[in-house]
Amino acid sequence: MDLNKIYEILYLLQDMRSFELYGTVGAVVCCLDSINYLTEDGDLEKTFRTVHNYLDPDGLILFDVNSPYKFREIYGYNSYILEDEIDGCSVYCGWQNSFDEKTGICDFYLTLFSENEDGTFSRCEEEQKEKMYTLEELKGALETCGFEFIGAYSGYGFEAVDEKTERYYIAARAKK
């Protein structure tokens, strides 16, 4: 069954700060802490303005972000070693974090080892960067860009956020 045909979903790969659509939509969903990857000044507002431009009146934006608690306490200057098995092959990840409280930027340094069929391992290194946003900053940017803040939730069950919430799930409505 082709879900794209059932739901008529058009998937596009574009920069979220300046994407273009062929009309308006009822909702925009941005997941996997993609908003945290907006690290330059003005990127957050630019993204929210672009989204607002393509939403129907009263359209929704739904997104998740890593919380300040997660940046400070979970990421911080911590290092992790993770291991898993995928399709019978071992995968190892060395993960180091460097968080700058002044800029709100966290640099992630990942070293991945994945087992090849012959038992040897391939190594891959990756660097990522995310920016911490407070709930107040997100609310302010949404309102500046023409949104009505609906709520922030902790988890998929719409629980209230608290000081130890690791991920905010946020909903806002476009005011037209």
List PLM regions with ranges:
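A short, glycine/Asx- and small/polar-enriched loop/turn
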Residues: 25, 104-106, 163-168
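A short hydrophobic/small-residue beta-strand
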Residues: 61-62, 149
